[in-house]
């Protein structure tokens, strides 16, 4: 079966694994998914990323991060721009998530980046997701 929205699949797998407090989650790999995972790593939402090939398709293994007493680091994750309804923002309309407590992942002409970087570089683009 063909996957219509692989980014939503990544976010849903992370959300579901986080909800039941799994240590790792495995997702099929792609360049966009790697960039989103690297952003989650840089922002402190996941511990590490491992890439491996199971023979059929390359996979990403994401180690989820939890606080003391298994408190979730990711409280919410939401897909914004979808294949059926793309959401774009201008350079002066880049969204803030929870007044700066969360991040918005934005796809710009200079690559995929966090809302802070897009604002700093004066770039707009497609709003991929919110993470808080």
Curated annotation (Swiss-Prot):
The keyword Transmembrane helix does not apply. Transmembrane segments: none annotated. Keywords: Ribonucleoprotein, Ribosomal protein, RNA-binding, rRNA-binding. GO terms for molecular function: rRNA binding; structural constituent of ribosome. Belongs to the universal ribosomal protein uS8 family. Part of the 30S ribosomal subunit. Contacts proteins S5 and S12. One of the primary rRNA binding proteins, it binds directly to 16S rRNA central domain where it helps coordinate assembly of the platform of the 30S subunit. This is Small ribosomal subunit protein uS8.
């Amino acid at each position: 079966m063909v996957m219509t929205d692989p980014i939503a699949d990544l976010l849903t797998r992370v959300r579901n694994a986080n909800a039941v407090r799994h240590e790792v989650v495995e997702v099929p790999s792609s360049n966009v998914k790697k960039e989103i995972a690297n952003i989650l790593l840089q922002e402190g939402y996941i511990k590490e990323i491992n890439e491996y090939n199971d023979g059929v398709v390359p996979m990403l293994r994401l180690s989820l991060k939890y606080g003391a007493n298994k408190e979730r680091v990711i409280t919410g994750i939401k897909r914004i721009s979808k294949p059926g309804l793309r959401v774009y923002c201008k350079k002066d309309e880049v969204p803030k998530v929870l007044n700066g407590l969360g991040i918005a992942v934005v796809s710009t002409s200079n690559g995929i980046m966090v809302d802070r970087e897009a604002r700093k570089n004066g770039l707009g683009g497609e709003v991929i997701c919110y993470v808080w």
